[in-house]
Amino acid sequence: MDQEESHVISIFETLGAYFINIFYNFLYKNALYKKHSIVTEYQYQVKGYILGVKQNKKLYEKMLDSFYKYFCNITQINSKTLNFSNFVSTIVDSFIPKEYSQSISLEKKESILELLLCDYISNLGTFITTEKMLPFIIKNRKENYHKVTKEMQDYSLTFLLKKRMELYNKFLRKQAYVEPETELEETYARLSSYNRSLLHQIEELTSEKKSLLADLSTLRKKYEKRQSEYRRLVQLLYQQIQRSSTSKSSYPLTKFIETLPSEHFSNEEYQKETPADQKEVVETELLRKQELLTSQELTSKSPNNYPVPHSRTIVSKPSDNYPVPRSRTTKLDFDNSLQNQELHTKNGFSEKDIVEFSQDKPVFKQDKPEEENILANNQDNPEEEDILAIKQDKPEEEDILAIKQDKPEEEDILEFNQDKPEFKEAVLDIKENILEEENQDEPIVQNPFLENFWKPEQKTFNQSGLFEESSYFSNDWSGGDVTLNFS
């Protein structure tokens, strides 16, 4: 063994002796003052000391200062000659190669020493608290003193030598690495490696972005295609609704519109084709037409509302004994006129006699007129007499019609519309067209509209003058005279 190695071993043995004394004597004395069992309490003391040195900075500095004093006493070196910094360098230099000792600063040496001591204390405490060593430390201490301390010193020296070899290898590996010549080159190499990693991340993100954009484009095309199909279907449906609303047996337009989604009416392209105001007007007009068609359909089905033609479609020449309807009369009014005419014929009166008789007595009075009955029954009510008096001042409808005989209806209309010459021209044109149609000798055309219309019943009178209904009805009745059968 050379002198250098002997110097290193002496330093390691001094280091081991200090900490073995702490574990074997100092911590054992602290465990004796506790109430728990000595074994358990000694284990707590060992663990507490290890954690305190590692985690508590003040406890570590106190421990290092105590070790510095112990080292000076053992080596018999004056503390003035060996200061604290030299002490740290002496301990650390025994673990690292000499060629690196001068290149390492004092701060780095202090950090290396702290790591070495914490690691050493942790391993030594673990070895002492094993089942092999713990009984010899607690029991029969005097008999086992030399044996236990020797084993602890051997373990301490072996661990420190092993640690020295590890540090040597680290420094040798570092020496094999070619360091940059300057600090700038080192910074450049570090930034270059970091830049390469960033470029790799950028490439990955770019490829991911491209894939996402491709997926987005595909989804957008699908969406536009579906949207166009949807708008086309909605427009076709709306056109179908408009066509169906014009038919008589159409479903109400509002029912179809309610089934449509609200997005259909808020579509931009659809709003351009049909604005909102125009669409509302169209819908309102369609609804009005639908209601009008429905009302006309119901009116046409009613038997009391059959129209009576005003032109020469059925009756070619008016008859003296058969009334020709001049207004929109019903079948009931027509039958009543027939009955009145038959009664007059039965009693031997003709139409001329009835007219002459009516001229002498224009008003037929009853035995008790309505006014006299009202006055007789309401003598105590003077208000009703006043009402009748007021009524006398008002001409009746017959007088009004007599006054208006000199002014036909057309003249009244033309007189009322003097300020509108175009209206007068339209009325005159219509009148001329009617006169031209009457003067033309056109054949009688059966109106197909009246195929299912009511047909006048043919009356047959017996010898007593009473009429009886015939079971035969003519489908081509032309409004001629009624046949009287007295056979």
Swiss-Prot record:
It is a single-pass membrane protein. One of its GO terms (cellular component) is membrane. Induction: Expressed in the late phase of the viral replicative cycle. Keywords: Coiled coil, Glycoprotein, Host membrane, Late protein, Membrane, Transmembrane, Transmembrane helix. The chain crosses the membrane at residues 7-28. It comes from the Viruses. Residues 196-235 form a coiled coil. The keyword Glycoprotein applies. Residues 294-305 have a biased composition (Polar residues). Glycans are attached at N73, N83, N195, N462. It is found in: Host membrane. Residues 294-324 are annotated as: Disordered. The keyword Membrane applies. Belongs to the asfivirus B475L family. This is Uncharacterized protein B475L. It comes from African swine fever virus (isolate Tick/South Africa/Pretoriuskop Pr4/1996) (ASFV). The lineage of its organism: Viruses, Varidnaviria, Bamfordvirae, Nucleocytoviricota, Pokkesviricetes.
